Structures are given as structure tokens and as C-alpha cells.
């Protein structure tokens, strides 16, 4: 494309000295770095980002109401943001997932992991031949048609379902959307396979895109700790950890969640895998309250899985989230038999691994128990983290031996 035919984009001019993160190829521009916008740009529209002297730095999407004023599509000045751009990004991402799916025998995985796959604000999960789309930023929404066209080019047989019904869209002035985009409607419960397990996924009504694919490897790792053990599975959702624990030979697994619908699917998942349902108990309750009740009644477990939802959405909530994580892990530690195993996780991006480890150490002190860290977890390999965007490493976890 020649200079004369190349699209002319509005220019976002940065304040002096605020270009360093872009020079290190971080994909976000925060409001405090912005000097002015030259030209007019609608919500989500493509803009060029330049330093205070006009030197070109990147091309991204404009979001005037967000603290993240721009999200970078490309650091290549010769790259236009069009259907061909999205097709290239999708094919690049698919190469890694194809290899991984063949190696691990997967029929479901994360195809696009936002910024780490060069598509900020875009999440795409594959469940069989269904692609579940979440557009979380203004730029992603603005490019919806181009992205869907690229998806159809890369996988013409896929059925696309939109799950952009997440509250974070409101922060950038967007309505929540959900429904079929192309192809057939997903069934109420779609069976997938994961490490020898069959699991039912609720694409239309489940959490996020229907299932937490990021915990795939952690669910598998659970099996080494549970043989002949009594297991407590907190925040169980649809029972992936419970099924894995039963496949690992546990004596009993108690799954706790506030959603009866999720617990009903968890029960179906146990039955689907022809596992002993008498070893599985399903409790609808608040985890904090139930753990305190178990402590009062002297209940004990050999393994506790603690996989709570995100406790922190922004920095102002971090201190409160730290207290929540400490309290819940303290209660879990108190309920474990000597030598018991705590498998504990945080999916909060603002919670670093070092901080999470310190919280568990503080919880152990408050519980009056010694704890050994014996294994560390992170999101599965279909959720890569690009080196210039450490925020992409949002899921962290530890296996702890409680003395």
C-alpha cells in the first residue's frame, strides 16, 4: 500500500516523556500520558499514536471515556487495520492452538487471548465447532464486522456465538450483547473433552464464555494429591475439579457453590463420566459461611481446592481483596488434617504471584499452622502471555502442604 492510498488516521499525541511504555511495546496508553487528539475519532475508531514531536509510535483504538485511552493494534506503521489484519492475527494464533490441541488431545481451547495474541479486548474460546466471542473494549466492538469476517475466512464451518454480556463493557460506554452471530445455536449443554474427562458446557448461560478453560492443567494436577482423600471443592462451578478428583481416586469430594444450576451440571458431569455418584456431595451455600460452620463443627478434609471468582477489579479494591483472600485461605488451612493439601488460586490480574504467596503465608500464621509451598500453577498454555504485557498473567495458584 502506497502513502497516497494508505488510510489517514486521527493522531493521538502523547505528552513529553510518556512514550517509554510504547517503545517497550506495551499495548496500553493511559489517560495521564495523553496530550491531545488531533482530528476527530469516534469511540473505538483507529488512531495513530505519536510522541510529542510527532514521531509515529503505534496504531490503536480510541476510547475517550476509559482510563486506557488507547489499545494498540500494531507497532508496524505499514499495517492497516482491516479484515486482512484480523485474518493474519487469527491464523497466527491458530497455529499454536492447532499444535497444542494435537499434543494434548483438545477439542476446546482459547483461540484468542486478547493483548497477548495482538488483539486487545478480544477473547475467543473454541468449544468443538462453536466459537464464543467476547468483545471487551471499544476498539474490539468497532471492528466487530471485520473480525467476524476474518473468523469466517479462517474457519468457514464454525458457528459463532456472542457472549459480550460482561459489565466491563459499560466502562467504555458500550451496551451488553449476547446471541448467535453465524451458524446454529449452541445446545443448552455442549459436551467437550479435557484430559480424559467429558464435561458439559453452558455456552449461552454459563460464566464468561461457558467454562474456565484456563484451569485445565490445574484440574489435571489435582489428581496426584487426592487418592483415598476427602476433598473439599470450593467455588466449584460445574464441577471440573470434582470430576478430576474422582478420576484421581478420591474417597469423597464435597463441591460448594452458590449456584444451584452450576451444581446440577456438576452432578450431570459426574454421571456423564460414569463415576461413583455416592462419593460426590453437592452443597449450595456461601463458601465463607460454610467454612466457618465446618470449623465450628470440627469437620476436617485432606485436600481443599480454593478457586474463587475475581475479588479485585481495580487498585482501589486491592486491600479489601487481600483481606478476603487471607480470610478464606486461613479458614481452609484450619480445616485441613496435618499433611493436608491446599490448592489455592487467584484469577485477579492485579494480584501478583509474590503478593498472593505472602497472603497465604499470613493466612498460615493466623491459622497457627506451618505451610510448605510445593507446586505453582498458572493459566493453561492456550492462554499465552506476551513478554511486553505482564498483566496477561492473571491466573496464579499454589499447592501447599499444611503441617
Curated annotation (Swiss-Prot):
Record's keyword annotation contains S-adenosyl-L-methionine: yes
Alphabetical keyword list: Cytoplasm, Methyltransferase, RNA-binding, rRNA processing, S-adenosyl-L-methionine, Transferase
Gene3D superfamilies: PUA domain, RNA methyltransferase domain (HRMD) like, Vaccinia Virus protein VP39
A GO MF term: RNA binding
GO CC annotation: cytoplasm
SUPFAM superfamilies: PUA domain-like, S-adenosyl-L-methionine-dependent methyltransferases
Primary location group: cytoplasm
Cited InterPro entries: PUA, PUA-like_sf, PUA_sf, RLMI, RlmI-like_PUA, SAM-dep_methyl-trfase, SAM-dependent_MTases_sf
Catalytic activity: cytidine(1962) in 23S rRNA + S-adenosyl-L-methionine = 5-methylcytidine(1962) in 23S rRNA + S-adenosyl-L-homocysteine + H(+)
Domain PUA stretches: 9-88
EC code(s) of this entry: 2.1.1.191
Compartment annotation: Cytoplasm
Pfam family for this entry, one: Methyltrans_SAM
Entry annotated with the keyword Transferase: yes
Family: Belongs to the methyltransferase superfamily. RlmI family.
Entry function: Specifically methylates the cytosine at position 1962 (m5C1962) of 23S rRNA.
Protein name: Ribosomal RNA large subunit methyltransferase I
Source species of the chain: Salmonella enteritidis PT4 (strain P125109)
